[in-house]
Amino acid sequence: MLSKKSRAVFLTAVASGTMLNPLNSSMISLALHSIQHEFHLSFTTVSWLISSFYLASAVAQPVTGKLGDLIGRKRLFLFGLILVAVSAIGAPFAPTFMTLLVMRLFQSVGSSAIYPSGVGLIRNHIHERQASALAVLSIFASAMTALGPTAGGFLIVWGGWPAIFIVNLPFIILSFLLGLYMFPKDQKKGAGIKTIIRQLDILGIVLFAGGIIFLLSFLLSFSTSPHAVEGVLGLLLLCAFVWRELKTDKPFIDVRLFKTQRNLSAVYVQFILLNVFFYCLFFGLPSYFQDEMHLSVQTSGLFMLFMSGMSIVVSPLTGKWIDRSGVVKPIFAGALLMTAGAVLLTIFFINVQTIGKGLILSLLGIGYGLGNVALQAAMLETSPSNMVGTTSGLFQTCRYLGSILSSVILGILFGKEITAAHFDMMGIIMIIAGGASLLMAVRFAALMKTAS
């Protein structure tokens, strides 16, 4: 059993590593404007920094979760930190956008390897108040996601966009040194290549990644001229992926769940919609603030704090509401506030004073905070008890799919320039997403009533 001091050091080692994925997924939002202008890119092209990160995370997290079981969690955790360190050192000196994109992929894969390894290390070595220990990781992740844009804004003022990569180094060094010292040596030797290939659905992974990449390229091409062949290839690969997952014993994504668990499927659909909505704001607003409203990167970051700050404040309150009343009412309230916020954003945001803008963003933050916590609780409530690990992994995949879809929407809307008309169009899309979330919330309430 770990002493109180050793437990704190162990958790610090894990948390300072696992926070890197949410921190880097959100800090980039304030840097897109600077990177776009430095490399002379369209928004469509620079948006690949968003979509590629989430696509790599969607593939890497479940894969590295299995790899940790096979080759050892300490080994994989430290290797993930090394990959993120490579990106932190290499990205600031990237001579081309393609080099920067590769560094961003290193960052995504490395930070994705750290999270499942960190959770596994806590489950194996912290047995007293384990739920509290895991809650620390959740709090760190939520705080980093929410505060990333604001922190990124101040870092960019200090050292330009390279600063958002360099800032990772102190956390990497801290996590690596503490982990090297605190984490027990892996019990098992590293598995062989043949064993790893047998345990991983390599074909499923390739079909999934290939299908998403081709569809992304097809959808983003709408800002210029549509690449129909890529769209057809993407659909064919995804159809082949579904067929493969239905046939194999160890699927990359267990698509059977969508057919057998209707309540859970409704949660997944709502979570995708929530993340499309949120990440359109998360990545779209900073670019609009800087390009069209000509606000400084620092001011843009402070504006984003209205939304992210309220989502942090409302999250623990939502947990208490769920404990008293269940998940149905908070899910509906979150969808209602999202829709109302989107309407206010579209109609009034451009013309109101600063306090009005802050209130609208705060309302949107409350809606997201309610939905995010309530849907996580609903996922756990509707999951079969023997499949929580699988359903939790799929839940994260839905987050990444929503994020990827938002980057496509923004790439199409803001492809050549960012204007008030494009902002209004984004607002209309968000109203549609909010309305769909409301309908799904009503549907979910009916399903839960039938189940009870």
Swiss-Prot record:
SUPFAM superfamilies associated with the record: MFS general substrate transporter (SSF103473)
CDD domains per UniProt: MFS_MMR_MDR_like
Membrane topology per record: Multi-pass membrane protein
Pfam families tied to this protein: MFS_1 (PF07690)
Highest taxon of the lineage: Bacteria
InterPro entries in the cross-refs: MFS, MFS_dom, MFS_trans_sf
Major site of localization recorded for this protein: membrane
Database matches in PROSITE patterns: MFS
One GO CC annotation: plasma membrane
Entry keyword annotation includes Membrane: yes
Gene3D superfamilies hit by this protein: MFS general substrate transporter like domains, Multidrug resistance protein D
Compartmental location: Cell membrane
GO biological process, alphabetically ordered: transmembrane transport
Single annotated GO MF: transmembrane transporter activity
Segments traversing the membrane: 8-28, 39-59, 77-97, 100-122, 134-156, 161-183, 203-222, 226-243, 266-286, 302-322, 330-350, 359-379, 393-415, 425-447
Keywords linked to the UniProt accession: Cell membrane, Membrane, Transmembrane, Transmembrane helix, Transport
UniProt similarity note: Belongs to the major facilitator superfamily.
Name this polypeptide is given: Uncharacterized MFS-type transporter YwoD
Organism: Bacillus subtilis (strain 168)
Name of the coding gene: ywoD
